[in-house]
């Protein structure tokens, strides 16, 4: 994109207004949008609609990437790749129902139970990803990570950041529940910390 110094005055003013109004996509792609409007001979209302819709889509894209970044997902989380032949634990109909996320809207908790290697973490990660795509703030961590965070948040800045992220999450998936030996001193969690989610 051209620098402000080399732009015509009206483009410079539009770009500055877009930045001040926190419309980064419009500020960055103004030339492209103006050229398209001229090519298609858009009306004023069509041009305005184009600007706002593209800004909105870009905002949704950036919001999704931010939620995905902070979700704590492993490398593989695409439920389309789930191998239904390897386990009798869940069938395709049940998977489709889970992916509809009705259980989130109804604030149900899910408990995934099975032997090691049957895909519990993969399913939980995939459902977290489905929730992120649907606009939810979701987070995946192990039970050990959760309790370490709760125990050290007052003395550790990273732990406090994780704690704040957990408290803002609309869906929390807790992995490796049966692998972490609970100590009595760690079991007492304050009421605001109790979240709905998957375990």
Functional labels for PLM-detected ranges:
Residues 79-98:
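N-terminal pre-Walker A segment at the start of P-loop NTPase domains
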Residues 100-107:
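Phosphate-binding P-loop
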Residues 112:
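Hydrophobic anchor at the beta1->P-loop junction of P-loop NTPases
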Residues 115-134:
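Walker A/P-loop
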Residues 158-186, 190:
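Conserved nucleotide-sensing/catalytic segment adjacent to the nucleotide-binding pocket
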């Amino acid at each position: 994109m051209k620098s402000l110094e080399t732009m015509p005055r009206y483009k410079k003013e539009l770009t500055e207004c877009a930045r001040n109004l926190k419309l980064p996509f419009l500020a960055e792609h103004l030339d492209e949008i103006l050229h398209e409007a001229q090519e298609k001979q858009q009306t004023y209302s069509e041009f305005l609609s184009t600007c706002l819709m593209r800004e909105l889509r870009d905002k949704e894209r950036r919001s999704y990437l931010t939620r995905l970044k902070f979700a704590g997902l492993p490398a593989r989380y695409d439920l389309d790749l789930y191998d239904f032949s390897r386990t009798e634990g869940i069938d395709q109909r049940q998977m489709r129902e889970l992916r509809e996320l009705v259980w989130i809207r109804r604030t149900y908790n899910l408990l995934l139970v099975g032997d090691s290697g049957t895909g519990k973490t993969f399913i939980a990660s995939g459902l977290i990803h489905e929730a992120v795509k649907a606009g939810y703030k979701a987070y995946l961590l192990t039970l050990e990570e959760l309790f370490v965070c709760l125990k050290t948040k007052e003395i550790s800045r990273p732990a406090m950041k994780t704690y704040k992220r957990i408290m803002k999450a609309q869906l929390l998936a807790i992995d490796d529940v049966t692998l972490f030996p609970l100590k009595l001193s760690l079991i007492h969690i304050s009421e605001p910390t109790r979240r709905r989610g998957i375990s």
